[in-house]
Amino acid sequence: MNLLTVGLSHHSAPVRVLERVAIGADELGKVLHELLQRDHICEAFVVSTCNRVEVYAVAETFHGGLEDVTSVLARHSGSDVAELTDHMYVFYAGAAVEHLFSVAAGLDSMVVGEAQILGQIRQSYGVADEAGTVGRTLHELAQQALRVGKRVHAETGIDSEGASVVSEALADAETELGGLAGRRALLVGAGSMGGLAAAQLRRAGIGEVVIANRTAVNGERLAESLRTDGVPASAVALDGLRSAISWADLVVTCTGAVGAVVTTEHVETGDRGPLVFCDLGLPRDTAPEVAELPGVTVVDLATLQRRLSEQQGGNESERAAAIVAEEVRGYLAAQRSAEVTPTVTALRKRAAEVVDAELLRLDSKLPALEGDVRDELARTVRRVVDKLLHAPTVRVKQLASTPGGSGYADALRELFELDPQTAAVLGTAQADDGRARGSASVAEARRAGAPGARDELRDLPAQDGDDR
């Protein structure tokens, strides 16, 4: 089996590509089930945010799994596979573990250190768990990633290096408007991103908020929450956008809808002050033509991506990265140690069978042996065998936790002629430093999977069946 991460993010793809591939909440279950219907995918969950779309999967073969994931994403986005893979990356084995831990820690975010991604991973896993597309491998991986993210935020000050994309967008709006205190804001969308934006607006001292949402009850619920916190707020239907925009100084959009929600027809640019749009949707909620209107400024994910692409983490990011590296080593060591357990179990089973056979032989040779004597002999033989096996079985578990340690389990199976099916161990290609090798662009990986082209991508792990 192979652990794969296949995806796109702000690091590898422009917003125009990301918004085509973005998977809305109402589509996520369908995409997950389509992945599981493919020939090589055994488990899967998908993280789709404003900055990334990533599939975490357990596949029977590396290249088969890669082809399955890329074809599903291409079909979903309506893109050609070759065009899409130019912007995609793949991590496998330990590198996939390291990537997810880094994402959970906020180290791979557009705004380094933002904590929102933790909730997004938790929600993504929850959807997959409910859909029945995750098994033991991804369950353990996702839960450990969430623990790593929490530890990083608890033990470092990485939060101070970046709150969220929302805070960065509102900081730009504050600059354009000369401050947000007392201003009027229209919030389009009342989902998780909308809730985060509402909280940021409240902290910025916004004067009043109107919430427009497709589902009226959700918009009213968010408005009530703001009113409870002392911010005047009300909710309107989406068909009231034009009048609400004419009233607002700031419009924050985060609907997750497919296609533009705000067009030039919604915006009046007559005798009024500056109007700022913070478009946090993926795909974008605001039509590109809106940015060309006089007096209008649009801050969107593409704007933030350009500005933050050169952002470098400070000392807290380095501390966070050290924690991630430590956690990756620990996780991989634990996985390798767990993988040798079937071999140890098979060895002890073989020893017990030998003891039982010898005791039966003793019974046939000495049928008159008294019961208490026979029982003491049996206990003695079993104690001797247990003591002989104790040191090597403990040691093999310790050695198995080191890079390349699976070879010790192989040696045990060979020496004691253990059934490889009974003592199956899933191998993972490891680098000398304990981190599994395994990252490349999807284009490189797909070329490496083509006949006659395997040498183009070095260090690919051995695969099952025809992919070996």
Swiss-Prot record:
Known EC number: 1.2.1.70
Assigned keywords, A-Z: NADP, Oxidoreductase, Porphyrin biosynthesis
Enzyme class: oxidoreductase
Gene Ontology molecular function, alphabetical: glutamyl-tRNA reductase activity; NADP binding
Pathway in which this enzyme or protein is active: Porphyrin-containing compound metabolism; protoporphyrin-IX biosynthesis; 5-aminolevulinate from L-glutamyl-tRNA(Glu): step 1/2
Reactions catalysed: (S)-4-amino-5-oxopentanoate + tRNA(Glu) + NADP(+) = L-glutamyl-tRNA(Glu) + NADPH + H(+)
Annotated site location: Important for activity: 99
Pfam family membership, one: Shikimate_DH
Catalytic residues (UniProt): 50 (nucleophile)
Region (Disordered) location: 428-468
Keyword rRNA processing: no
Residues that, per the record, bind substrate: 49-52, 109, 114-116, 120
Coiled coil: none
Any one of the GO BP annotations: protoporphyrinogen IX biosynthetic process from glutamate
Written domain comment of the UniProt record: Possesses an unusual extended V-shaped dimeric structure with each monomer consisting of three distinct domains arranged along a curved 'spinal' alpha-helix. The N-terminal catalytic domain specifically recognizes the glutamate moiety of the substrate. The second domain is the NADPH-binding domain, and the third C-terminal domain is responsible for dimerization.
Main function: Catalyzes the NADPH-dependent reduction of glutamyl-tRNA(Glu) to glutamate 1-semialdehyde (GSA).
Quaternary structure annotation from Swiss-Prot or TrEMBL: Homodimer.
Note from the entry: During catalysis, the active site Cys acts as a nucleophile attacking the alpha-carbonyl group of tRNA-bound glutamate with the formation of a thioester intermediate between enzyme and glutamate, and the concomitant release of tRNA(Glu). The thioester intermediate is finally reduced by direct hydride transfer from NADPH, to form the product GSA.
Similarity remark: Belongs to the glutamyl-tRNA reductase family.
Protein name per UniProt: Glutamyl-tRNA reductase
Gene name, Swiss-Prot/TrEMBL: hemA
